[in-house]
Structures are given as structure tokens and as C-alpha cells.
Amino acid sequence: ARKVGRLLFLSGVGPRAANQKEIPGVELDVNGKIKSYDIEKQCHSVFKNVRYILEDAGSSWDNIVDVQVFLTNMKDDFSTYNKIYAEYFKNNQPCRTTIEIKALPTPIAIELKIISTI
């Protein structure tokens, strides 16, 4: 995260659990390629990671003003992700952009970029 004035910028936040190599909801083959994944588990994990980073930097979930979401499979994953997103953002509804991309640098299906106030 990077603080600029009263803003906090988070980028490249994925579902990997802190200080672990394991990615919740991802099964890899022997070559490290995604064999299967559970977008629901990844969504919950990425939101947990965002909350941790925000609080560690002196912000909070309710201070999020903008969310960019990168999904690797919009067709199959958007409805599940959107349902979970709505659960997390009941009281605070920031601006949001959801983009499908071909791949992410690690074997994950979702990554977030966040702007929050402090």
C-alpha cells in the first residue's frame, strides 16, 4: 500500500494467504498450472486481505472509494463474485470497475486495486 496525502492506494491484492504459498481455493497440477479453482473461496480471501492491509495502514473498509477488479473468467465467475461483493459492500458502495483479463502473474482468478481514504 502507498499513502499519498489522505489517500491510500492498494494494488495487486490477490487471494493468497499472508506469509503462505498456498492460494485458497486453487488446485495446481504438477507443472504449477491451475487444475481447478473455487472463485468463492478466492473472493472471500481477497476481501480479507484488503481489510487487513487497510486496517494495518490506518484506514478501514468503509473508507474505500474505488475498486478495480480483475477477473480471469468473467463468463463463469462474475455472478458469484458480484454476489459476494454485494455482501461485503452493503453499507459502503464505492465506484467499481470489473475487467476480464487473460491471466494474472500468479495462478489466481481475481485481483483487486483499491483506493481508500485514511
Residue map of PLM features:
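Short, polar/acidic, helix-capping and beta-turn segments at strand->helix junctions
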Residues: 1-118
